[in-house]
Amino acid sequence: MEKFTDLNYTLSVITLMNSTLHTILEDPGMAYFPYIASVLTVLFTLHKASIPTMKIALKTSKCSYKVVKYCIVTILNTLLKLAGYKEQITTKDEIEKQMDRVVKEMRRQLEMIDKLTTREIEQVELLKRIYDKLIVRSTGEIDMTKEINQKNVRTLEEWESGKNPYEPKEVTAAM
């Protein structure tokens, strides 16, 4: 019988809450009620989730200040996101991490520029050497009597032993 009365009591509480919500929602001045309710729900959830988390973190952590600071920053960033802001709150540690990352990236870029500059200088020196070798130099007087390459061409009289080396010869094979 006690379970039945508990169930009856629970149902009456739910009915009372539903009727209260319906009367609030019917009022035209409460157009923002769903937004207010969602913000209150989020705040309540954050409160219920953050208190035990912070208690455990403070007990187990050696540096409680950093934990509290991190929890507060996280809660404020969540509220800012819910409000529609794109900006976030950052701690000095995060700023230092980002600055270290930026400095590391700048060093990497400078090393890359240094390597590329060295390569470009080497390429310019190589091109200068190639250009120096390709420069036309005057060799004095050029023999233009034979314009085409006929220095190795011989006539029948110029051949040794007077025979044409390109004529086919008879070849006999041994059996």
Curated annotation (Swiss-Prot):
Chain residues that bind Ca(2+): 120, 123
Modification(s) after translation: The N-glycosyl content is primarily Man(9)GlcNAc, with a small amount of Man(8)GlcNAc.
UniProt keywords, alphabetically: Activation of host autophagy by virus, Calcium, Enterotoxin, Glycoprotein, Host endoplasmic reticulum, Host membrane, Host-virus interaction, Ion channel, Ion transport, Membrane, Metal-binding, Secreted, Signal-anchor, Toxin, Transmembrane, Transmembrane helix, Transport, Viral ion channel, Virulence
Highest taxon in the source lineage: Viruses
GO CC aspect terms: extracellular region; host caveola; host cell rough endoplasmic reticulum membrane; membrane
Localization of this protein: Host rough endoplasmic reticulum membrane; Host membrane, Host caveola; Secreted
Membrane spanning residue stretches: 29-51
GO biological process: monoatomic ion transmembrane transport; symbiont-mediated activation of host autophagy; viral process
Keyword presence, Endoplasmic reticulum: no
Topology, Cytoplasmic side: 52-175
GO MF terms, alphabetically ordered: channel activity; metal ion binding; toxin activity
Membrane topology label: Single-pass type III membrane protein
Sugar attachment sites: 8, 18
Subunit (UniProt): Homotetramer. Interacts with the immature particle in the viroplasm. Interacts with host CAV1, early and late in infection. Interacts with host integrin ITGA1/ITGB1 heterodimer. Interacts with host integrin ITGA2/ITGB1 heterodimer. Interaction with microtubules blocks trafficking to the Golgi apparatus.
Record-stated family: Belongs to the rotavirus NSP4 family.
Role this protein plays: Plays an essential role in the virus replication cycle by acting as a viroporin. Creates a pore in the host endoplasmic reticulum and as a consequence releases Ca(2+) in the cytoplasm of infected cell. In turn, high levels of cytoplasmic calcium trigger membrane trafficking and transport of viral ER-associated proteins to viroplasms, sites of viral genome replication and immature particle assembly. The secreted form acts as an enterotoxin that causes phospholipase C-dependent elevation of the intracellular calcium concentration in host intestinal mucosa cells. Increased concentration of intracellular calcium disrupts the cytoskeleton and the tight junctions, raising the paracellular permeability. Potentiates chloride ion secretion through a calcium ion-dependent signaling pathway, inducing age-dependent diarrhea.
Free-text comment on this protein's domains from its UniProt entry: Binds 1 calcium ion per tetramer.
Protein name: Non-structural glycoprotein 4
Biological source species: Rotavirus A (strain RVA/Human/Japan/KUN/1980/G2P1B[4]) (RV-A)
